[in-house]
């Protein structure tokens, strides 16, 4: 759901919600995780996921892309067993430190959201996938952990969420 760039009419919101619900049903049918884009719509998203969880149980799983909410909102997504993904924005604002400190490490993922929100020290340049390491470094710093420990945990999280098996 993205209520930021669209005209916020009830018709537009309703249509987005209907399509999201269809998408959730398809993901569950094929046992695939959801990658959730949610902007200016956390309450609506939480309500839909909670309702669909009642219908589908733990087969419904996924990740909240570019999580930019509060610790209170994070807890609600975590209770639904959705991981939270952090971007380069965490490297240039302290607004997310509380969330990063409190989210269980096994529920954290990282991303770049290329070409936007380039992390420090690359601000002003086009974002690239290679810069995700800066997001990992920031998480390690905020949590007072070793970067390798964070990398290892995030890799395990990705494998779990996407059901990737080691060969």
Where are these regions (language model features)?
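Divalent metal-binding pocket/active-site signature
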Residues: 1-80, 98-103, 122-127, 144-147, ...
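Mid-to-C-terminal alpha-helical segments outside catalytic/metal-binding sites
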Residues: 26, 131-167
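Active-site neighborhood of phospho(di)ester-bond hydrolases with catalytic His/Asp-centered motifs
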Residues: 35-36, 63-64, 86-87, 109-112
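Generic structural signal for helix capping and beta-alpha/helix-loop junctions
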Residues: 44, 94, 117-118
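Short, acidic/turn-prone active-site loops that include or flank metal/cofactor-
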Residues: 68, 88-92, 114-116
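Active-site glycine- and acidic-residue-rich loops that bind
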Residues: 83-97
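Active-site phosphate/pyrophosphate- and oxyanion-stabilizing loops and adjacent acidic/basic residues
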Residues: 97-98, 137
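Short acidic/histidine-rich active-site segments
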Residues: 106-128
């Amino acid at each position: 759901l993205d209520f930021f760039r669209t005209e916020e009419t009830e018709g537009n919101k309703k249509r987005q919600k209907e399509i999201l619900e269809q998408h959730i049903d398809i993901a569950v049918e094929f046992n695939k995780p959801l990658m959730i884009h949610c902007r200016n719509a956390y309450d609506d998203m939480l309500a839909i996921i909670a309702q669909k969880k009642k219908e589908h149980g733990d087969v419904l799983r996924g990740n909240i892309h570019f999580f930019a909410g509060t610790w209170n909102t994070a807890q609600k997504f975590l209770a639904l067993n959705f991981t939270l993904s952090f971007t380069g924005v965490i490297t240039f604002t302290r607004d997310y430190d509380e969330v990063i400190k409190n989210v269980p490490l096994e529920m954290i993922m990282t991303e770049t959201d290329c070409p936007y929100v380039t992390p420090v020290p690359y601000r002003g340049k086009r974002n690239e996938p290679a810069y995700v390491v800066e997001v990992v470094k920031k998480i390690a710093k905020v949590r007072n952990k070793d970067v390798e420990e964070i990398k290892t945990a995030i890799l395990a999280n990705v494998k779990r969420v996407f059901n990737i098996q080691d060969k």
